[in-house]
């Protein structure tokens, strides 16, 4: 799965001259937290976030309400945006996991997606979570099970074979290293057409594996 499969295409974009107040209004009205700032031909110049629009109280000093209003109306996107040279971006053909690793490493909540110096999309932590939910079958009825398996070749196959022999289908799955147990992995599966009791009986019959959690998702 690649960034281009999960990113938000055609994000709302603003110019450097856009008043910061208008940028904030756009964010509120469209329920977004990031706005790419672009120049001619959608070339990336910077990024506005909710945090960059925060004015420290110390900057307001002893100004009265009218002076504060005038000060805020004079602030432009280019005055508060994350500049291009400090911006972390990604290619649309990058893998989803590389995007996640980059966001974690750089501690950022989004990555503008750039192709040939043009903004073609934006991928955010919300996009990542939405895709994770989809990969694990979020919002779909079924039985969800977490199985701890030895980190050996063929362990996943045992589960898929045992389930398929019953005529059931695994329509979502995902795995990760077990916490503090480097020799084991936790595999999450979601199965339709089986009851929790039926699936549990099959999984408990697989030697060397342990069912950590099993529940029916209505």
Regions found by a protein language model. Name each.
Residues 177-185, 215-218:
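Short proline/glycine- and acidic-rich turn/helix-capping motifs at secondary-structure junctions
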Residues 1-10, 50-87, 91, 96-104, ...:
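Tandem CBS (Bateman) regulatory domains
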Residues 184-193:
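Short basic, glycine-rich beta-strand/loop surfaces that mediate nucleic-acid
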Residues 1-50, 58-59:
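Basic, Lys/Arg-rich alpha-helical nucleic-acid-recognition elements, primarily the DNA-binding modules
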Residues 27, 35-51, 103, 111-126, ...:
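A glycine-centered beta-loop-beta connector
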Residues 37, 82, 113, 175, ...:
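Hydrophobic/anchoring residues in structured secondary elements
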């Amino acid at each position: 799965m690649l960034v281009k499969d999960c990113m938000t295409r055609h994000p709302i974009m603003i110019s450097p001259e856009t008043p910061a107040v208008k940028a904030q209004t756009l964010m509120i009205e469209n329920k977004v937290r990031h706005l790419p700032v672009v120049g001619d031909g959608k070339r990336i110049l910077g990024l506005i976030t909710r945090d960059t629009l925060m004015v420290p109280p110390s900057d307001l000093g002893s100004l009265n309400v009218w002076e504060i209003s005038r000060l805020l109306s004079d602030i432009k996107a280019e005055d508060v945006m994350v500049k291009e040279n400090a911006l972390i971006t990604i290619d649309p053909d990058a893998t989803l996991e590389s995007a996640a690793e980059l966001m974690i490493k750089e501690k950022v909540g989004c990555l503008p997606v750039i192709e040939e110096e043009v903004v073609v999309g934006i991928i955010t932590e919300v996009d990542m979570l939405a895709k994770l939910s989809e990969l694990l079958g979020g919002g779909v009825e079924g039985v969800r099970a977490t199985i701890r398996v030895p980190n050996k070749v063929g362990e996943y196959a045992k589960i898929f074979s045992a389930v398929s022999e019953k005529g059931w289908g695994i329509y979502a799955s995902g795995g990760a290293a077990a916490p503090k147990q480097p020799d084991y992995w936790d595999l999450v599966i979601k199965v339709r057409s089986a009851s929790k009791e039926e699936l549990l009986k099959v999984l408990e019959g697989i030697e060397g594996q342990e069912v950590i959690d099993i529940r029916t998702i209505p």
